[in-house]
From Swiss-Prot:
Domain of life: Bacteria
Gene3D superfamilies from the UniProt entry: Glutamine Phosphoribosylpyrophosphate, subunit 1, domain 1 (3.60.20.10)
Organism name: Shewanella putrefaciens (strain CN-32 / ATCC BAA-453)
Family of the protein in this entry: Belongs to the peptidase T1B family. HslV subfamily.
The name this protein goes by in its record: ATP-dependent protease subunit HslV
Function as written in the Swiss-Prot or TrEMBL entry: Protease subunit of a proteasome-like degradation complex believed to be a general protein degrading machinery.
Gene, per the UniProt record: hslV
GO terms under cellular component: HslUV protease complex; proteasome core complex
The entry's keywords: Allosteric enzyme, Cytoplasm, Hydrolase, Metal-binding, Protease, Sodium, Threonine protease
Length: 174
């Protein structure tokens, strides 16, 4: 699996991900980029799950963003509708975290769209560790969103065997 974490604070949103690709108990690659910029660099997206499945979802989500002029929530809901009705999409095993200047969302493997409660989202095998670390840092420090995302991903990588210390970090300032 992997760990993807998104943190929003003080007009900044960040999505960070590790680089480990595992096949069973074997590390196949350590420097995969699981975080990308979409729609004219105005949307950030990260994935956890099967790599090929995630690329399919990235392509579909980017098409929805183009169709809906970059409106994040509408694009996510339309992708979720497709996910529930398209046989091929229903077999994909991946989750997306997407964010723009206004919202952060999780698009789940069941075709659900969830907006987080605390301006932070974490998915993947190390997601719970990253989320706990990020929430503690959000509530008890004045660190930036970038610093919180980086530190929480480091903590997840120290605990989760399917998460490494190679980081891809993208940020939007608005």
């Amino acid at each position: 699996m992997t760990t993807i974490v998104s943190v929003r604070r003080n007009n900044q949103v960040v999505i960070a991900g590790d680089g480990q690709v595992s096949l069973g108990n074997t590390v196949m690659k350590g420097n995969a980029k699981k975080v990308r910029r979409l729609y004219h660099n105005k949307v950030l997206a990260g994935f956890a799950g099967g790599t090929a499945d995630a690329f399919t979802l990235f392509e579909r989500f980017e098409a929805k963003l183009e169709m809906h002029q970059g409106h994040l929530l509408r694009s996510a809901v339309e992708l979720a509708k497709d996910w529930r009705t398209d046989r091929m999409l229903r077999k994909l095993e991946a989750m997306l975290v997407v964010a723009d200047a206004e919202a952060s969302l999780i698009i789940t493997g069941n075709g659900d769209v969830v907006q987080p409660e605390y301006d932070l989202v974490a998915i993947g095998s190390g997601g719970n560790y990253a989320q706990a670390a990020a929430l503690a840092l959000l509530q008890n420090t004045e660190l930036s969103a970038l610093e919180i995302a980086e530190k929480s991903l480091t903590i997840a990588g120290d605990i989760c065997v399917f998460t490494n210390q190679f980081k891809t970090i993208e940020e939007l300032n608005y």
